[in-house]
UniProtKB/Swiss-Prot annotation:
Organism: Solanum lycopersicum
Keywords assigned: Chloroplast, Membrane, Photosynthesis, Plastid, Repeat, Thylakoid, TPR repeat
InterPro entries: PSI_Ycf3_assembly, TPR-like_helical_dom_sf, TPR_rpt, Ycf3/AcsC/BcsC/TPR_MFPF
Compartment list: Plastid, Chloroplast thylakoid membrane
Keyword Thylakoid assigned: yes
Membrane topology: Peripheral membrane protein
Nucleus found in the keyword field: no
Family to which the UniProt record says this protein belongs: Belongs to the Ycf3 family.
Gene3D superfamilies: Tetratricopeptide repeat domain
Protein's name in the database: Photosystem I assembly protein Ycf3
Protein function: Essential for the assembly of the photosystem I (PSI) complex. May act as a chaperone-like factor to guide the assembly of the PSI subunits.
Length: 168
């Protein structure tokens, strides 16, 4: 039985029911349906903090999913898990891969900026202001891209860009 069928969360159950109805009425292949089931189960496991299970489901969804747009969200979610696990290099790789397939993911740009900013802060703590500035400059570029895609969002990032004189 798919994980999403046994999840006790009302929102997850509602999402699963709606998704099942849509899968019945929208013409899709069996592979697309199976990919979506794995993706949905991955999201369910991820929301509960079961990252290993979520990754297994996402990797299986990636194997089956052929649509680049849908693949971008799978890759993005894999990046989120690696970010949560502190595996920032891997996370950046998955965010890049997601953006290759869908350049309109402001949340991926934002998460990449957050990682770069964090690395800049680490460099300051280690006394390397030159490396810190390079990381901060990279964070600024990613935040600018996120803001360009969704101008009303990322207010804190916009303020940081203004305060640090990185916003044009």
């Amino acid at each position: 039985m798919p994980r999403s069928r046994i999840n006790g969360n009302f929102i997850d159950k509602t999402f699963s029911i709606v998704a099942d109805i849509l899968l019945r009425v929208i013409p899709t292949t069996s592979g697309e349906k199976e990919a979506f089931t794995y993706y949905r189960d991955g999201m369910s496991a991820q929301s509960e903090g079961n990252y290993a299970e979520a990754l297994q489901n996402y990797y299986e969804a990636m194997r089956l999913e052929i649509d680049p747009y849908d693949r971008s969200y799978i890759l993005y979610n894999i990046g989120l898990i690696h970010t949560s696990n502190g595996e920032h290099t891997k996370a950046l790789e998955y965010y890049f891969r997601a953006l290759e397939r869908n350049p309109f993911l402001p949340q991926a740009f934002n998460n990449m900026a957050v990682i770069c900013h964090y690395r800049g802060e680490q460099a300051i703590q280690q006394g390397d202001s030159e490396i810190a500035e390079a990381w901060f400059d990279q964070a600024a570029e990613y935040w600018k891209q996120a803001i360009a895609l969704t101008p009303g969002n990322y207010i804190e990032a916009r303020n940081w860009l203004k305060i640090t004189r990185r916003f044009e």
